[in-house]
Amino acid sequence: MHPAAEHSPLGKSSEYIATYTPSLLFPISRAAKWAELGLTAQTLPYQGVDFWNCYELSWLLPSGKPVVAIAEFSIPADSPNIIESKSFKLYLNSLNQTAFATVEQVQTTLEQDLSTAAGKPVGVRIRSLSDIEGEGVATLPGVCIDDLDITVSSYDRPQPELLCCDESQIIEESVHSHLLKSNCPVTSQPDWGSVVVEYRGAALDHSSLLAYIVSFRQHSDFHEQCVERIFLDLQRLLKPEKLTVYARYVRRGGLDINPYRSTETLDVNNRRLARQ
């Protein structure tokens, strides 16, 4: 378990506070997890963002009438801190019985509080239900590798040694899998996700990639660090000209987390998948 996470509200019974309480937010430094991967804030080999989508945002108008909305949060991948997910939920719940004059006031409040917790500016977008109703669900780019036949014997740790490639072939492709699963490092609850790999480099063996993704199945780590580990393992193997790893996780407690790491300029459509 991440040492700071032991002191977070995750996995503990909590009082649900219904009036605005920004102190509920619990930041966790990224530094310890970066160190496990041999990284520091100054040596990150990627740029990126963590997209959080909130489906349970509500507050009151001055008249006392409730408003409901959906919010998108963009936390920079190089921010000093992540925000522990249960504390994020508790904080958002604290808006439920709080009056705001305008949606802009809600947005400004969220931007200020989340940026303070993350240690870097956090983007906030608040959308009405009617804005989203016609969007439907997205499909992931490239080839789905989930139907490949593989033999799996171990699930307790990520196994980069399973990965292999053909260095004689340099290709550019996108592949994806819906079989990503890891466990919360605090509660051991399952985290279900889909992952996209886009790259230009030595041709990656698809069966080996699928076996590697499945090897995360009993691994305990936060969503963000799982994606960073995948990125680094593929970067070491492929030595690619460009590489993007992007995961979309199933929501829990009204929030889903979608980490994006890339050697390239951010270019992603934050649209939900069928399981989200």
From Swiss-Prot:
Compartment annotation: Cytoplasm
Any one of the GO CC terms: cytoplasm
GO biological process entries: queuosine biosynthetic process; tRNA modification
Catalytic activity: 7-aminomethyl-7-carbaguanine + 2 NADP(+) = 7-cyano-7-deazaguanine + 2 NADPH + 3 H(+)
SUPFAM superfamilies associated with the record: Tetrahydrobiopterin biosynthesis enzymes-like
InterPro entries given in the database record: GTP-CH-I_C/QueF (IPR043133), NADPH_dep_7-cyano-7-deazaG_red (IPR050084), QueF (IPR029500), QueF_N (IPR029139), QueF_type2 (IPR016428)
Binding positions (substrate): I83, E84, S85, H223, E224
Residues that coordinate or bind NADPH: S85, K86, R252, G253
EC number(s) given by UniProt: 1.7.1.13
Highest taxon above the source species: Bacteria
Pathways involved: tRNA modification; tRNA-queuosine biosynthesis
Catalytic machinery residues: C184 (thioimide intermediate), D191 (proton donor)
GO MF terms, alphabetically ordered: preQ1 synthase activity
Keywords: Cytoplasm, NADP, Oxidoreductase, Queuosine biosynthesis
UniProt signal peptide: none
Record note on quaternary structure: Homodimer.
Family membership noted in the UniProt record: Belongs to the GTP cyclohydrolase I family. QueF type 2 subfamily.
Summary of the function given for this chain in its UniProt record: Catalyzes the NADPH-dependent reduction of 7-cyano-7-deazaguanine (preQ0) to 7-aminomethyl-7-deazaguanine (preQ1).
Protein name, as recorded: NADPH-dependent 7-cyano-7-deazaguanine reductase
Organism: Pseudomonas savastanoi pv. phaseolicola (strain 1448A / Race 6)
